[in-house]
Each structure stands twice: as structure tokens, then as C-alpha cells.
Amino acid sequence: MRERQFVAELVSSQELPKMFKVRQTFPRPRIEPEDIPGIIRGYLSEEAFASKVRPGMRIAITAGSRGIANVALVTKTIADYVKSRGAEPFVVPAMGSHGGATAEGQKEVLESYGITESYLGCPILSSMEVKKIGVNEEGMDVFIDKYAAEADGIIVSCRIKPHTAFRGPYESGIMKMMAIGLGKQHGAEVCHEAGFKNMAKYVPMFGKAIIENAPVLFAVAVIENAFDETCKIAAVRAEDIVEKEPPLLKEAFTYMPRILVDSCDVLVVDQIGKNFSGDGMDPNITGTFCTPYASGGINAQRVCVLDLSPETHGNGIGLGYSSATTKRVFNQLDLASMYPNAITCTVLGGVRIPIVMESDKEAIQVCVRTCNEIDKKNPRIVRIPNSLHLEHIMLSEAYYIEVRNHPGITIESEPEYLPFDEDGNLW
């Protein structure tokens, strides 16, 4: 108790500035959910795609572990189309080592997104077994999901977006869904063993080998806007993936939300969680990259995490890239759910535990207190709810004059002190 009070006293004299609310404006192209089935059916009815799905074929459709907008609807629409062609669809989880690296765990991940056999009207065949389908250009064995390998055709359903740990022409998208998603635990380990330094090489190298040696028919890829909504759908034939995925990734970059001020002294993140990013908080937003092979996001000297989302179930991955957190976060951590993914991807930094303070106020205070070469009486603080929802954020008074004429920022309130309760918490 004495030590606790001593630590609190070290930061108690650090005053915190007034904050004001702003609304950030981003482009918002959007496809309404009710329009999605018609768009997908329209693409797949073209001869280039329809000719690949023939009566009697058993066709595997991939489904991943990310919370993609309208993912259940997209998957069902593809399955319904396959059935309309007289073929037999089934869904395979394509998520590397996620879901606890077990068949049942991966099926449960899909069910949490509404991807169930009853909704789809077709089986979900989940297995961690893989089958060798060939070798890549460097002579390395290539394995994919056993059920997919034995199918007559594979349709890759996925989202295309920037990755959080490496840069290249193929990041999170079709190639990665094949190389790591369909590769299961084996594929994830092989690619990650080489490190993120080589990921931009390994993902397309394994992906191309899968296109050449597995019955991949085509891909149905979605892109999301800054509001986590479907804004584009693309159908890509297997033989066109190499050429057409990179431009789609470039387009996905343009739709990413961001914090419209370039830098701050302290970034306060109300919640992190796997439902916001595979990294807990998306470093493309927060600048908290786990490797030197990707960059971007806001330039913050300190990052403060106040809470975990309920949906992350104690998985505090990403916490290790913050400077300080709260006892509230510490008490929720489920290390058993945090560590497996970190071990598989060979990057341990995200599951470290930063300095733990008793309250929200103390956590923010210690971040300001330990910044170097700043005006500690008027610090530049940015507060966001999470790394996914960035329309409404808060800025400290130091930004007030600066953003008044910013074309993408609308001031929504006057500066006020944060409403800490008697324990120093915001909720």
C-alpha cells in the first residue's frame, strides 16, 4: 500500500489539460447490405466465373477469423450461388492458427460471426489436418487444409486491407488467405518462422504455389471504408490474382481511417481488443508497430490504454506497445489467450505488460509526466475510443486553434476537464 501511494504521489502533481470533442470527416462510399447478394451474383454470373462452377462439383469456400462487415452474408451468397449451379458448397475455416489452433475452436470463431451451417445451408468442415499439394519456387513443401485440397474447387472469400506488421504488394488479402489461412497452423508457422522481414516475399511465394497446385477457381474480395462498412466487392479469377490484388490493396489504403492530426505527446486509447484489430489496436492508426517493416499512423511519444473490449475476452494483445495502462486492464488479462498467437507469429512485444497504474487519471498522468521536450502545462493529447471507430475523438486544448480551420475536422464542444470520478476513473 505504501509503495502504491508513493507511485501515485510521483505523478499526482501533473495537471491534465482540458479536452474538446471533434468529428473527423472521411469519404464514405458504401454498399448497402441488401445490395450485396445482387452484386456478388452479378459478378459470378459472368461467363469467366460461371464456367468454373459445374454441376456435381464439391466446392470449398474460405471463411476467416476477422470481424469483417457482412461476412456471413457474403459467405452465404457465395454458397447459394454454388448451389444454383448444381454444385455442392461447403465452408472451411481459413485462419492459420487462430481459434486456439483447434478444429472446434475455429468453427466456434465462425459461429461467433453468424457463419453457421443453419444460416449458410451448407456444411462447415473444420479440421487442422493439412495435405501437401506441391512445392513453391524455392522447393519448400506447400500444405493446405485437407478438405480444401480434396475439393473439386476452392473459392477464396476474404477482405483486402493493409497489414499491421509488413508492407508489400500483397498484405492482408487473397494471397495471405491462401498462404496462411488455408495453410492452417503449418502455413502460419512456416511463414512466420521467416519473420515479418520476409513476409512480403513468403506470402505471394506460397500463394502462387497454391494457385498452381490447388483447385483455386476464383476469389471474392471485399474492401471496407473508414467506418468498417463494405464499400467495394471484387471477383478475381485465379489466373488474375497475381496481377489484380496489388491495385485493390492500394485502393484499400485510400479508405483507411486515420487520426487527422499528425502527432501528439500522448495518445489515449479507451479500449483495445481483437474485435478492433488482430493487433488489439491497429498500428496503421496508432503508430504502434510490432516490427520495423511497416510504418504509418500518428506519431505519439506515449500511448495509454484504459480498458479491454468485452468482445476480446481478456486477450490483451497489443498492450505491450503501450507506455502505461490501468489496474482495470491488468485484472482482465487472460494470458492463455494472449500468448499462443504471439508465439506462432514469433513477435512477443505485443503481449508484454507496461507500467500499471491504479486509475485512468494516473495512467494518463504518468504518460504526460514521462514525455520529453514537451510543454507539460499544455500537452498535446489525443483520445480515441479504439483504433476502428475514429469519427468522434477528443483533442486537448493545445489543438484548439490549430484545428479550427482544418477541412476534415469539426469542433463539437468547448474544452472541458475530463470527468474523472472520485477514484480517478472515467467509467
What is the predicted role of each segment?
Residues 4, 283-288, 292-427:
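C-terminal non-catalytic interaction/assembly regions of soluble proteins
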Residues 58-60, 265, 302, 380:
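Residues that mark the start of a beta-strand
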Residues 58-67, 90-97, 382:
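Short glycine-rich or small-residue beta-strand-to-loop segments that form or flank ligand, phosphate
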Residues 69-89:
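Histidine-anchored nucleotide/phosphate-binding helix
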Residues 143-273, 287, 296-298:
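Conserved, well-structured core segments that form the ligand-binding/active-site neighborhood
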Residues 105-169:
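An acidic, phosphate/nucleotide-engaging active-site surface
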Residues 1-38:
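N-terminal amphipathic/basic leader segments beginning at the initiator methionine
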Residues 44-60, 83-84, 261:
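Glycine-rich phosphate/diphosphate-binding loops that line cofactor/substrate pockets in enzymes
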